[in-house]
């Protein structure tokens, strides 16, 4: 579902929205689709090659995500529409790739992270 994908990607440092599609059987709280905010990416100065890397990260994470099988309640044994399992190896690789991209294109380049960590962490 869109909720599975958005949640798994968020765990890996990629933020997007889960959105309904026309005639979506899952409704607005689960959804079947996701929406990417490309203006945020281009505002950071990313271009075609970075978008290809983002697409690769998304593909990796979605390929490593599956619905969690419910283990209790009346739906025990059924796949959840909200909960998911994300392969830990996939998550680690995706986080590393996301970090590498954001190291090159920081969201807030004017922040002194060393100062903030020293005084507020």
Residue ranges with predicted function:
Residues 11-35:
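Conserved PLP cofactor-binding pocket of PLP-dependent enzymes
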């Amino acid at each position: 579902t869109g909720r599975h994908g958005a949640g798994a990607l968020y765990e890996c440092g990629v933020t997007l929205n889960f959105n309904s599609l026309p005639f979506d059987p899952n409704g607005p709280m689960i959804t079947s689709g996701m929406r990417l905010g490309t203006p945020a990416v281009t505002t950071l100065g990313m271009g075609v090659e970075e978008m290809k890397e983002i697409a690769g990260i998304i593909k990796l994470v979605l390929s490593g995500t599956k619905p969690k099988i419910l283990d209790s309640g009346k739906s025990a044994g059924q796949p959840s529409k909200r909960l998911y399992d994300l392969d830990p190896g996939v998550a680690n690789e995706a986080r590393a790739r996301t970090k590498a991209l954001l190291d090159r294109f920081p969201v807030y380049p004017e922040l002194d992270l060393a100062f903030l960590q020293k005084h507020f962490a």
